[in-house]
Each structure stands twice: as structure tokens, then as C-alpha cells.
Design a protein with these regions (language model features):
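Structural microenvironment flanking redox-active thiols in thiol-disulfide oxidoreductases
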Residues: 54-94, 105-108
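Conserved hydrophobic packing residues within short motifs/helices of P-loop NTPase cores
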Residues: 41-43, 75-77, 121
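Short loop/turn microsegments at loop-to-beta-strand junctions
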Residues: 19, 41, 117-118
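Structural signature of beta-strand start/N-cap positions in the alpha/beta core
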Residues: 39-41, 73, 99
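Short active-site neighborhood of thiol/selenol oxidoreductases, capturing the structured segment around
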Residues: 34-51
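Thiol/disulfide oxidoreductase modules built on the thioredoxin-like
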Residues: 89-96, 102-147
Length: 154
């Protein structure tokens, strides 16, 4: 019972904290949840040394490229790196088209405890955190989830 209560409190803290995030990407652009009202927002924590993180990058690129001008924003937060240039060079080599934030513990704290990498947070168009996943994601899973929630509200 105590574990359930602690888990619930952690999830509530994540929701309350993450709703106010402010992230500056590698190009100097500031991303806030409020600036994306009306759109789904996917925030993905990853690292260059993390195989599951690398496996999901093509899906994140595909999601960003398909929906960036319509209903979904993708933001990547690189964690556990020693050299920012290494991360940015890696992102270029992978043709990552979505914004990359050079993360740290202060940035991660805006979302609550980071359980592992990769971790993905999904916010609905109203700005509410509606899902998060520790571990890899797929394009199909994200699209299915968004479509299921979008059809419910119609």
C-alpha cells in the first residue's frame, strides 16, 4: 500500500512539475509547454551511449517530420554526456531534425525523477501530461495513442 501511495505522489509531482517546463535548445530557442497549447508535445530523454535511445531516434525523426506543422512537437533532451559538441555532432550525423536540448539534472528535475533512459513524456493539446514511458517507443505506438485520444474527444 505504501508503495502505491509513493508511486501516486511521484506521478502527481511529475505532472505538476512538468507542466511548467522551460527548455532552451542547442540553437537558443526556448520551448515552453504553454507555447505549444493546442498541440501534442513529446519530450524524450536520451543519451548517445544508450542503445534503446538510438533505436528510437528514427521514429522520433519520423514523428517530428510528419507532424511538426500540424499536431505534434518533438523535443529531445540529451543526458549524461561529457562534451556538448559530441552530442550535437552525433545529432547531425543521425540527421535529427527535432530540437535538441543539452540536458542536466536541473532540466530533468522539471519533469520529476528520471527512472532511466530513454524516458518519454507525452502532453496533450491542453498541456496535461497524459503518458510517459521508461524504455523505447515506436512511431506506431505514439500515433495510435494520440489517435485514440483524439477520436474520444470528437
Amino acid at each position: 500500500m505504501l508503495k502505491r501511495i509513493l508511486l501516486l505522489l511521484t506521478m502527481l509531482a511529475v505532472t505538476a512539475t512538468a507542466s511548467a517546463f522551460s527548455l532552451t535548445d542547442s540553437k537558443g530557442k526556448v520551448h515552453t509547454l504553454d507555447s505549444y497549447k493546442g498541440k501534442w508535445v513529446l519530450v524524450n530523454f536520451w543519451a548517445t551511449w544508450c542503445p534503446p535511445c538510438l533505436d528510437e531516434i528514427p521514429a522520433l525523426i519520423a514523428l517530428h517530420d510528419k507532424y511538426k506543422n500540424s499536431r505534434l512537437e518533438v523535443i529531445g533532451i540529451a543526458m549524461e554526456y561529457q562534451n556538448p559538441k559530441q552530442v550535437l555532432d552525433f545529432a547531425d550525423s543521425m540527421f535529427i531534425s527535432y530540437p535538441i536540448v543539452l540536458g542536466n539534472s536541473k532540466i530533468a528535475a522539471q519533469f520529476g525523477p528520471l527512472q532511466g533512459l530513454p524516458t518519454t513524456y507525452l502532453f496533450d493539446p491542453a498541456g496535461k501530461m497524459v503518458a510517459y514511458q521508461v524504455g523505447g517507443i515506436t512511431q506506431q505506438a505514439v500515433e495510435s495513442y494520440i489517435n485514440s485520444k483524439s477520436t474520444v474527444k470528437k
